[in-house]
């Protein structure tokens, strides 16, 4: 068997429907769109979620909640993520961004106590949870606000 002798299995390669290419094709004339009306026109048809005039689901369901524009977005970093830093490293927002631990828009960064710390880090400009503070200080690190 050679490469040029290979052919796809029967029915695996379906031909596309070429509409509007003459009456002999069986799809000429109205091009499978029917006679006149909104759905025959260019740009015709219904929008996604249209239910035939029935009140659509997104309008039947009640509105809930609101977006608080004063809310502060706080990104979370766990102690287990900080192993990549060297001993006695100063960890601040810029250092976390540089290593790829935090991305995007945010107001503050908070260090949480999930994981263990074996190195003495100095944290700057970070919020720190109680358990994280205990683990950092036990490892000989410090926190500067």
Curated annotation (Swiss-Prot):
It comes from the Bacteria. It holds the Pfam family Ribosomal_L27A. Residues 21-31, 42-52 have a biased composition (Gly residues). GO terms for cellular component: cytosolic large ribosomal subunit. SUPFAM superfamilies: Ribosomal proteins L15p and L18e. Transmembrane segments: none annotated. GO terms for molecular function: rRNA binding; structural constituent of ribosome. InterPro entries: Ribosomal_uL15 (IPR030878), Ribosomal_uL15/eL18 (IPR021131), Ribosomal_uL15/eL18_sf (IPR036227), Ribosomal_uL15_bac-type (IPR005749), Ribosomal_uL15_CS (IPR001196). Residues 1-58 are annotated as: Disordered. GO terms for biological process: translation. The keyword Ribosomal protein applies. The keyword Ribosomal protein applies. Keywords: Ribonucleoprotein, Ribosomal protein, RNA-binding, rRNA-binding. PANTHER family: 50S RIBOSOMAL PROTEIN L15 (PTHR12934), LARGE RIBOSOMAL SUBUNIT PROTEIN UL15M (PTHR12934:SF11). Part of the 50S ribosomal subunit. Belongs to the universal ribosomal protein uL15 family. Binds to the 23S rRNA. This is Large ribosomal subunit protein uL15. It comes from Desulforapulum autotrophicum (strain ATCC 43914 / DSM 3382 / VKM B-1955 / HRM2).
């Amino acid at each position: 068997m050679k490469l040029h002798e290979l052919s796809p299995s029967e029915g695996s390669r379906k031909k596309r429907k070429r509409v509007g290419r003459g009456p002999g094709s069986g799809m000429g004339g109205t091009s499978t769109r029917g006679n006149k009306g909104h759905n025959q026109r260019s740009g015709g048809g219904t929008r996604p979620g249209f239910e035939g005039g029935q009140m659509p689901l997104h309008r039947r369901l009640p509105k809930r909640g609101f977006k608080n524009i004063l809310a502060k977005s706080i990104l979370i970093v766990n102690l287990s993520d900080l192993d990549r830093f060297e001993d006695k490293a100063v960890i601040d927002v810029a250092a976390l961004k540089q290593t790829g631990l935090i991305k995007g828009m945010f107001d503050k960064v908070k260090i949480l106590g999930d994981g263990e710390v074996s190195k003495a880090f100095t944290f700057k400009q970070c919020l720190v949870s109680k358990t994280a503070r205990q683990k950092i200080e036990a490892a000989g690190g410090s926190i500067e606000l």
